[in-house]
């Protein structure tokens, strides 16, 4: 027996409609389906009492996101981005063709851009920056010259 494939990456959100719009309109994810989750099995699986939750699945480039919105119990936490050295999920990277133009689109939509993270690596020709989804989940945008379909690690290999 072995792991067969990646299923999805789950993100807890406070406002489903706002988050679906953000991931769809700004990041290009395509909504697939929606499910309602509740009942004793859900309570046991999620280790939460009285679960009442909506999940919307979105997909882009073979990556599926599962956005979780809890009516009960209410979501906890704040909208501050997690420190990169905090254990667990750190950030999702999206490759873009023109970082500066893409940032203008995100800013125009009210996205919080962490301007102090904007970095240019002349040796690689790359530019990077972090921004936050509507609930503070870190998203890294990167512009790398060359074939956009070359996996990130291969782009930097041997340099």
Where are these regions (language model features)?
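Core segments of cupin and vicinal oxygen chelate
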Residues: 12-62, 101, 108, 122
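Exposed loop/turn and edge beta-strand positions of beta-sandwich/beta-sheet ligand-binding modules
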Residues: 5, 52, 88, 125
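N-terminal beta-strand motif that seeds the catalytic metal site of vicinal oxygen chelate
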Residues: 1-21, 30-37, 42-45, 89-94, ...
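Active-site/binding-pocket entry motifs
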Residues: 64, 73-74, 147
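Short acidic/polar mixed-charge low-complexity motifs
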Residues: 61-64, 137
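Vicinal oxygen chelate
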Residues: 1-2, 11, 78, 94, ...
